[in-house]
UniProtKB/Swiss-Prot annotation:
Renumbered residue ranges of the record's region Lipoprotein lipase cofactor: 78-100
Post-translational modification: Proapolipoprotein C-II is synthesized as a sialic acid containing glycoprotein which is subsequently desialylated prior to its proteolytic processing. Proapolipoprotein C-II, the major form found in plasma undergoes proteolytic cleavage of its N-terminal hexapeptide to generate apolipoprotein C-II, which occurs as the minor form in plasma.
Lineage of source species: Eukaryota, Metazoa, Chordata, Craniata, Vertebrata
Stretch forming the signal peptide: 1-22
Name this protein carries in UniProt: Apolipoprotein C-II
Cell compartment(s), UniProt: Secreted
Presence of the UniProt keyword Signal in the record: yes
GO aspect biological process, one term: positive regulation of phospholipid catabolic process
Single GO molecular function: phospholipase binding
Alphabetical UniProt keywords: Chylomicron, Glycoprotein, HDL, LDL, Lipid degradation, Lipid metabolism, Lipid transport, Secreted, Sialic acid, Signal, Transport, VLDL
Family affiliation: Belongs to the apolipoprotein C2 family.
Annotated GO CC locations: chylomicron; high-density lipoprotein particle; low-density lipoprotein particle; very-low-density lipoprotein particle
Lipid binding as annotated region, ranges: 66-74
Functional note: Component of chylomicrons, very low-density lipoproteins (VLDL), low-density lipoproteins (LDL), and high-density lipoproteins (HDL) in plasma. Plays an important role in lipoprotein metabolism as an activator of lipoprotein lipase. Both proapolipoprotein C-II and apolipoprotein C-II can activate lipoprotein lipase.
Protein backbone atom coordinates (compact mmCIF):
# COMPACT_ATOMS: atom_id res chain seq x y z
CA UNK A 1 0.00 0.00 0.00
CA UNK A 2 1.25 3.41 -0.88
CA UNK A 3 1.85 6.16 1.62
CA UNK A 4 -0.76 8.38 -0.02
CA UNK A 5 -3.39 5.65 0.24
CA UNK A 6 -2.66 5.13 3.94
CA UNK A 7 -2.76 8.87 4.58
CA UNK A 8 -6.10 9.21 2.78
CA UNK A 9 -7.51 6.21 4.67
CA UNK A 10 -6.31 7.64 7.98
CA UNK A 11 -7.94 11.02 7.26
CA UNK A 12 -11.24 9.40 6.26
CA UNK A 13 -11.28 7.27 9.41
CA UNK A 14 -10.39 10.29 11.53
CA UNK A 15 -13.28 12.32 10.09
CA UNK A 16 -15.70 9.43 10.54
CA UNK A 17 -14.52 8.96 14.13
CA UNK A 18 -15.19 12.59 14.93
CA UNK A 19 -18.63 12.35 13.30
CA UNK A 20 -19.51 9.35 15.46
CA UNK A 21 -18.28 11.06 18.61
CA UNK A 22 -20.23 14.19 17.76
CA UNK A 23 -23.44 12.22 17.18
CA UNK A 24 -23.37 10.72 20.70
CA UNK A 25 -23.57 14.10 22.44
CA UNK A 26 -27.11 15.21 23.33
CA UNK A 27 -28.27 18.52 21.96
CA UNK A 28 -28.09 21.30 24.53
CA UNK A 29 -30.39 24.28 24.58
CA UNK A 30 -28.78 27.66 24.08
CA UNK A 31 -28.34 29.60 27.31
CA UNK A 32 -30.77 32.46 27.71
CA UNK A 33 -28.06 35.02 28.54
CA UNK A 34 -25.35 35.71 25.97
CA UNK A 35 -21.91 34.46 26.89
CA UNK A 36 -18.81 36.60 27.02
CA UNK A 37 -17.61 35.21 23.70
CA UNK A 38 -20.92 36.08 22.03
CA UNK A 39 -20.78 39.60 23.43
CA UNK A 40 -17.22 40.04 22.18
CA UNK A 41 -18.16 38.72 18.73
CA UNK A 42 -21.10 41.11 18.50
CA UNK A 43 -18.96 44.01 19.66
CA UNK A 44 -16.19 43.27 17.17
CA UNK A 45 -18.74 42.78 14.42
CA UNK A 46 -20.32 46.16 15.12
CA UNK A 47 -16.88 47.85 15.17
CA UNK A 48 -16.01 46.17 11.87
CA UNK A 49 -19.30 47.24 10.29
CA UNK A 50 -18.86 50.84 11.42
CA UNK A 51 -15.27 50.87 10.08
CA UNK A 52 -16.49 49.51 6.73
CA UNK A 53 -19.17 52.17 6.52
CA UNK A 54 -16.67 54.91 7.37
CA UNK A 55 -14.26 53.64 4.72
CA UNK A 56 -17.06 53.40 2.16
CA UNK A 57 -18.14 56.96 2.94
CA UNK A 58 -14.58 58.24 2.64
CA UNK A 59 -14.15 56.40 -0.66
CA UNK A 60 -17.36 57.86 -2.06
CA UNK A 61 -16.30 61.38 -1.03
CA UNK A 62 -12.88 61.13 -2.67
CA UNK A 63 -13.83 59.03 -5.71
CA UNK A 64 -12.06 60.17 -8.88
CA UNK A 65 -12.98 58.30 -12.09
CA UNK A 66 -9.64 58.97 -13.80
CA UNK A 67 -7.66 57.62 -10.86
CA UNK A 68 -9.97 54.62 -10.71
CA UNK A 69 -9.36 53.85 -14.38
CA UNK A 70 -5.60 54.19 -13.92
CA UNK A 71 -5.69 51.84 -10.94
CA UNK A 72 -7.74 49.28 -12.85
CA UNK A 73 -5.37 49.47 -15.81
CA UNK A 74 -2.32 49.14 -13.55
CA UNK A 75 -3.91 46.15 -11.81
CA UNK A 76 -4.71 44.36 -15.06
CA UNK A 77 -1.20 44.93 -16.45
CA UNK A 78 0.50 43.80 -13.24
CA UNK A 79 -1.63 40.66 -12.92
CA UNK A 80 -0.89 39.79 -16.54
CA UNK A 81 2.84 40.17 -15.91
CA UNK A 82 2.72 38.16 -12.70
CA UNK A 83 0.78 35.34 -14.33
CA UNK A 84 3.25 35.27 -17.24
CA UNK A 85 6.27 35.09 -14.95
CA UNK A 86 4.55 32.53 -12.72
CA UNK A 87 3.98 30.36 -15.78
CA UNK A 88 7.63 30.68 -16.80
CA UNK A 89 8.76 29.86 -13.27
CA UNK A 90 6.45 26.83 -13.12
CA UNK A 91 7.78 25.60 -16.48
CA UNK A 92 11.37 25.96 -15.34
CA UNK A 93 10.67 24.24 -12.03
CA UNK A 94 8.90 21.31 -13.68
CA UNK A 95 11.71 20.96 -16.22
CA UNK A 96 14.26 21.00 -13.41
CA UNK A 97 12.37 18.41 -11.37
CA UNK A 98 11.50 16.17 -14.30
CA UNK A 99 14.86 16.32 -15.99
CA UNK A 100 15.19 15.55 -19.65
Amino acid sequence: MGTRFLLALFLVLLVLGFEVQGAQLPQQDEPSSPTLLTQMQESLSSYWDSAKEAARGLYEKTYLPTVDEKLRDMYSKSTAAVSTYAGIFTDQLLTLLKGD
